[in-house]
Amino acid sequence: MIRQNFNADWTVEKGDGNSRMNSFLGNTQTKTVHLPYDAMIHEARTPDTKNGAQTGFYPGGEYIFQKHFTAPQAWQGKPVSLVFEGVYQTALVYLNGWLLTRNVNGYAEFTVEAGPYLKYGADNLLKVIADNSLEPNSRWYTGSGIYRPVRLLVGNKVYLPQDTVRITTREAGEGFALLDVTAQVQSASTVTERVTLQQTICREGTAVLTDRQNLLLRPGESRTVSFRYCVDSPALWSPEDPNLYTSTLQVLEGEEELDREETSFGIRTLSIDAAHGVRINGQTVKLGGACIHHDNGILGAATLPDAEERRIRQLKEAGFNAIRSSHHPAGRALLDACDRYGVLVMDELSDVWNLRKNPYDYALYFEQDWKQTIQKMVAKDYNHPSVILYCVGNEISEAGSESGAETNRRLCNTFRELDPTRYTTNALNGLMAAGYRLREIMGDVMRKFPAQPGPSGGDGGGSNALNSFMSLMSGEKGDYFATHPLLTEALSGCEDSCDVIGLNYLTGRHVLEHELHPHKAVLGTETYPADIVRLWRIVEENPHMIGDFTWAGYDYLGEAGCGIFHYDGGANFSSIYPERTAYIGDLDLLGNRRPISYLRESVYGLRKAPYLAVLRMERNGQTSSKTPWMFKDNLSSWTWPGFEGQTASVDVYSASEEVELFLNGASLGRRAMVDFTATYSVPYTPGELKAVGYTGGLCDGEFTLRTAQDAQMTLTADRKTLQANGEDAAFVMIQFVDANGTADLHTKHTLKVELEGAGILEAVGSANPCSEERYDTPESETFDGCCMAVVRAGEAAGEIHLTVTADDSVQKQLTILVQKAEG
């Protein structure tokens, strides 16, 4: 079908259930927006919001989106539909006053038929009410409104329905690949039609094969057609070499093109088993995975393609080769980016089934909605080579019951029926699955470990209550819990019907499961970040262990305070305003890598050079709160003014056998690495701190920190040219760097950002997890020496001029070119 971007020229206003009367009385404030648009990020945060820390104290609400458009006379009699990739939470879609649909899954794409309700050659009004007023619902920051793109689809008398072209790799090797291509062809004609289907497959713009089929369609008939091809010397898709092809299928009547469908795909084979793990094209791949939520940091939930691409690129550069879409179906832009960068995907169905975790979550609708959600999910994912696993649920409350086991079986079977080329799993949490057995299990745990304190914090329910309790279940006690016979009994029902056994925070079971299920692969679907050394050792030593997914790869909004270091006696999971982010990602909210990211990279075997990190010296002698999701409150910095002569705790992370630390050229000793870490106590003296790694007595890498001198503000944009499409975005990092390139992470600065020209200032903010600053205002204070501005292109060509003022005095400017949009 012909696709038209339908994101421009919308208006949005706040609703309260009486929108028509408010509009009549003039009591509303209407804003013109270009989708995607997250309304929640523009709300004022309050300590008393119903969502509490779960959304970072952002409230929900009702939002009314409207768009006027003209339907050409040429559309009359043709199939016309609208595709909404994501509207949170409940969406009511009206066209010219007619209710077209009510969608209850805020993370699932949905399509509505528009043709019968259009006024051809006249003005039409499309209205979407996005209702996120029933709170709390999801256990994290959700966003509100039409936060993903909208497309208009127009067919012809014979057309190819959306997502019905499927390309399957049957065999692949160095010399050839065998492909099956199937497509659904639909007639909207009242007479018999004779058409030709022309298939072209291209690699980097060059056709590698073409084919044609003739087809007869009777009035209203739908037919499935099949092609089979042998591709010579294919460029296979893999995480290391993510080669992509494009399939173009045209519907021709003579020389006239009635329709076309362009599909990006990769040629690759996939298998998962207990003997070899995950194999892509016959080669074993261990999954170094990152769990991620769907927000884009200071942008909120708005799914800008450039934001999704940036996030995946940064995760890949940090050493991850896989992501888990937690805990809902991934958006199309995210999957496109994963295809391009070679990042494998575990796509996830839902955080709940039929038992609620929050009063107004998806459990209210799951039973009547899950099948169509799976159908849409598979249709969306099928041609993405990055997608290898479907996860049917996360920490499901009823997983340990007979009814839960039966639901698990139904879900897995449905995925297999719709897509037999991929594999199923379920992210099982022992505390949730134990059910009625939990009291007896915990009794045994407490008798084994009698001196352990009870859970603290946990105000507000949802994530806070669960996470607070889970924080006790780590280390030796967690392993005892994980391997308890009653827990084995509870998990067995769901494990039996999944292709891959998925375990959340049950490291003690990673080896045990192979004894219990010798023919099943096992995956750490969610694990504690600081346990990476132990976790990856298990992955490397056991073929049945296919990988590990850390929680989390990228910091995110909501579940606020999970990883914040409290030095004032505060407890994590206690809904402490103004905490806003979880603060537990390997990458912070702006995408900067934190020290644990470099430790992980060394553990993965991807980094030879050592890395240095220093505990924050302003916290010397203080004791902080601690949860298993927290690593260390450290920075890669040797700039600590005012702390001269005080002792700094310095970590060296390295895959070398030994490291030697030098301060201003003087050796502080050589030490053997223990679990990829060596720790030194160093009197802080400005200058140069250098770590040198040795393996077999030979130097195999070094890393140096220097004290920043007279750091000046710098502006660095990730791109200097945008398309004038209303959606392209540039991410501008604002830092303070000296003449030698050393960043000052210590000194704080107050920034004001101004924009003129062919774009808008979409967001300004820092990675500070606890701040009352808004992201939709032009002012921010730096955190760890950094702040970021997101610039979004307008719809006209020109230039964007960005001016940043620091501390009401120093200014820097940056120019970004906005070119006429392609197409």
PLM feature spans:
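Short, hydrophobic beta-strand segments
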Residues: 114-116, 227-236, 679-684, 778-795
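Beta-strand-rich binding/interaction modules
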Residues: 95, 176-216, 225, 648-666, ...
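Edge beta-strands of extracellular beta-sandwich domains
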Residues: 260-265, 697-709, 811-819
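Accessory beta-strand-rich segments of carbohydrate-active enzymes
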Residues: 2-19, 36-43, 54-161, 189, ...
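Extended acidic/polar, glycine-enriched regions
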Residues: 119-121, 182-273, 683-686
